[in-house]
């Protein structure tokens, strides 16, 4: 299947990688400045939301680097990747391990993929009341971020001993990466808590530190988590896309082709998310850089027109996906609703 993608789609450049990181950080930096200097509550709310969404492009650059797709240099990918992942509070080593070696290796495999696999009816019935509530909410548009929040908290912010050992085995720089992330988090909290202004390093914000912490940290992270959960859901959930038991899963390449959805957003949105919406091509060949994904996706569509799942974005199609994709029946191989 990779042979269907032209060779030029695999070309990578340090200069272009640095350019995309610079653009992503420029968007993030401008919204951070506008949030910190906001003079009205409405401006504060608006810039907190926008700042959360601009974490997406920085994360996508880091995601590319974790696949060694951003540039042809492993060293540049590591450095640029960790810088890019800081606003999303992610360690390069931990994300690379969980995303590359679990999600990509086991895409759409119920027992193994950590990309929010759906429960079946029996699993749902065994859940506690709170677990059922969380599951139901996470499959709604407003609370799609819950899908990602639990993964981030348990696997990235406070990984248990077993996960930490996995990360250390996967990369010798895990402790250093994690230290960078914690330092970034502390600095970000200190900024909105007013510590830097008390030290005379910057001007005071217009609002009380508690208000700034709420909007600068909680609201911003809420909308970043929502963006991550929402986009990931659209990539791997669709009324016509199946999930598989491990014993019945197709070969890896076939599974990536038929199970990854290409959501066709308007061009501006696609650019703002650095082409990650061209997701089938990314799963077939993760080493393709984000700046070549559109060409690679078009080539796959030409080669496999009946097997690539495409969905033109609209409020109706998004509503349908969330409405239908609740529980998965692995025997009947279809989506089902919640039990009464």
Spans of features found by a protein language model:
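Non-catalytic, topology-defining segments of multipass membrane proteins
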Residues: 1-54, 86-219, 291-340
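Aspartate-rich (DDxxD/NDxxD/DxxxD) Mg2+/diphosphate-binding motifs
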Residues: 61-79, 107-120
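Membrane-spanning helices that line or support transport/gating and their immediate boundary helices
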Residues: 61-65, 98-105, 229, 233, ...
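Active-site-flanking alpha-helical
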Residues: 31, 66, 70-71, 243, ...
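Active-site His/Glu-centered metal-binding helix of metallohydrolases
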Residues: 65-66, 238, 284
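Cytosolic juxtamembrane regulatory segments of multi-pass membrane proteins
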Residues: 249-268, 323
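Transmembrane alpha-helical segments that form the membrane-embedded catalytic/substrate-channel core
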Residues: 52-62, 91-95, 143-155, 217-247, ...
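C-terminal, well-structured subdomains that either form a transmembrane helix-short loop-helix hairpin
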Residues: 271-293
